[in-house]
Amino acid sequence: SKPSKSGKGKDDLRNEIDKLWREVNSLKEMQALQTVCLKGTKIHKKCYLASRGSKSYHAANEDCIAQGGTLSIPRSSDEGNSLRSYAKKSLVGARDFWIGVNDMTTEGKFVDVNGLPITYFNWDRSKPVGGTRENCVAASTSGQGKWSDDVCRSEKRYICEYLIPV
């Protein structure tokens, strides 16, 4: 066999190193997710982890993002019920908790934290009250985990959600 050109060899090596770095980073992400899932709970291809303290809606969402997740978003009644029972166990003493739903951009048009429209709602009777003051949504820890809109600056407990890559 002919000796390879040194340029091509370096490129191959560089590509291999890049590939290894991507694999290492992917493993790190999976490891972090495993830790979250172990500390919290795993439901419907998502892991949930309850907050220790209370924060405003924005601070809560930023905290979740910093940990690689978002505020939890129940996408069905099944998810909503599972989330509420986890909240009841892990947010002892909290009446409600922030979820990743708001109408900050357009009054009355509720979207998730990524700005995408949501199709599942679980509003309490006479909610949302609306108005430009109450733009962030909290779910109750009791009953059927009904939603109510509240002032975003209010300090509440929250649960972060992490999607499990399939």
From Swiss-Prot:
<protein>
    <recommendedName>
        <fullName>Tetranectin-like protein</fullName>
    </recommendedName>
</protein>
<keyword id="KW-1015">Disulfide bond</keyword>
<feature type="disulfide bond">
    <location>
        <begin position="37"/>
        <end position="47"/>
    </location>
</feature>
<dbReference type="GO" id="GO:0030246">
    <property type="term" value="F:carbohydrate binding"/>
</dbReference>
<keyword id="KW-0430">Lectin</keyword>
<dbReference type="InterPro" id="IPR016186">
    <property type="entry name" value="C-type_lectin-like/link_sf"/>
</dbReference>
<dbReference type="InterPro" id="IPR051663">
    <property type="entry name" value="CLec_Tetranectin-domain"/>
</dbReference>
<dbReference type="GO" id="GO:0001503">
    <property type="term" value="P:ossification"/>
</dbReference>
<dbReference type="InterPro" id="IPR001304">
    <property type="entry name" value="C-type_lectin-like"/>
</dbReference>
<feature type="disulfide bond">
    <location>
        <begin position="64"/>
        <end position="160"/>
    </location>
</feature>
<feature type="disulfide bond">
    <location>
        <begin position="136"/>
        <end position="152"/>
    </location>
</feature>
<dbReference type="Pfam" id="PF00059">
    <property type="entry name" value="Lectin_C"/>
</dbReference>
<dbReference type="InterPro" id="IPR016187">
    <property type="entry name" value="CTDL_fold"/>
</dbReference>
<dbReference type="GO" id="GO:0005615">
    <property type="term" value="C:extracellular space"/>
</dbReference>
<dbReference type="InterPro" id="IPR018378">
    <property type="entry name" value="C-type_lectin_CS"/>
</dbReference>
<feature type="domain" description="C-type lectin">
    <location>
        <begin position="43"/>
        <end position="161"/>
    </location>
</feature>
